Amino acid sequence: MTGYFLPPQTSSYTFRFAKVDDSAILSVGGNVAFECCAQEQPPITSTDFTINGIKPWQGSLPDNIGGTVYMYAGYYYPLKVVYSNAVSWGTLPISVELPDGTTVSDDFEGYVYSFDDDLSQSNCTIPDPSKHTTSIVTTTTELWTGTFTSTSTEMTTVTGTNGQPTDETVIVAKAPTTATSSSLSSSSSEQITSSITS
């Protein structure tokens, strides 16, 4: 089975086989499952599987085996499942745990899509989303002994979680300790963090 998985948000996704009888592999990503716009082409010979589950002959079924993949929202990721069964009964329940903790099982409507192969499509070549620069903005409010509110901004470049350069902006607002406690957190600082992918 092949298709394209469309993650709703940027984060880690954990794919699982609850039980495997007799064997199955799951591959996610180009160069692993299949190349973009080549869903029906001969298979890639990669052995870099996201999940590799095999029931031993005369043995018990593997339980809840899984693999985690970091994905970027809005990008279609090639997804391939290869399944085999020998001698009678077979099973392969598939699920994915979304970043918010929701588990989607067996019915992947709204998450997995299929398209006709057309290598001449102008949109077949896609950029690698992990190479995009990320911006992080952090705002901190601190109490201080001064009589006025002061704001400072510092900009730096750090290595992001994807190993790529990440622009980080830190905004520090200092408020006088005479401010009412209802307008500031009772702790010494309040932090709001947001990430923006450019």
Curated annotation (Swiss-Prot):
Stored PROSITE patterns: PA14 (PS51820)
InterPro entries, A to Z: Flocculin, PA14/GLEYA, PA14_dom
Domain PA14: 1-110
Residues in the signal sequence: none
A Pfam cross-reference name: Flocculin
Any one of the GO BP annotations: flocculation
Residue stretches in coiled coil: none
SMART domains per the UniProt record, alphabetical: PA14 (SM00758)
Family: Belongs to the flocculin family.
Protein name per Swiss-Prot or TrEMBL: Putative uncharacterized protein YAR062W
Organism the protein comes from: Saccharomyces cerevisiae (strain ATCC 204508 / S288c) (Baker's yeast)
